[in-house]
Amino acid sequence: MSNTYAINEGVLTRLHREPAAPLAGEVTVEIQASSINYRDLGIQAGFYPSRGGVVPISDGAGRVIDIGDGVTDLVPGDLVASCFFPFWEAGPATAANHCASLGCEMDGLLRSTATLPASAFLRAPDYLSASEVATLPCAAVTAWAALLTR
C-alpha cells in the first residue's frame, strides 16, 4: 500500500492506494524525499490551471523499484530525480511538451510510491542523498531554460 496525499478544496487528505505496476515506458519509484518550491505554492494558489484532487509536489527523488517494457535508461536500484515536465526533453517550450506536469495536471510526488513515464525521472549521482537530489529539479530546469531557451 502506498501512502499518498492529495489536496481537495484546500484540505490535505491522506489516501491509501495500491501502487500501479509499470506499463511499457513507465517506471515505479519508491519516493524517498520530496521538496516544496514556489511552483508548488503557485499551483495551490491557482496561478496554474490544475485538476482537482491532484497529488501535489513536483520535485522529488527516490530509487527505481520496477521498470516497464522498453525502458532502457533506468534500472531497479537507480537513484533518480523527478522532471516535472516529463514530455519536455529538448528545445523550446511548446503546448505539446507543457501539456502535463507533475503536481499540476499529473499526480505529483507527495506519496511513497509513484509509477510514471520513464521520462519523468533522470538518474542522479549516488554520491548525493535522496534529500539533496529532491532539491534540484526546479532549480535545474530554471537554469537550463535560462541558458538554453532564451
For each of these PLM feature ranges, what is it?
Residues 34-36, 69, 119, 141:
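Alpha-helix/helix-capping structural signal
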Residues 4-12:
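Extracellular beta-rich ligand/substrate-recognition surface
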Residues 85-150:
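NAD(P)H dinucleotide-binding glycine-rich loop of Rossmann-like/cofactor-binding domains
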Residues 18-19, 51-58, 101-106, 112:
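Short Gly/Pro-enriched turn/cap motifs at secondary-structure boundaries
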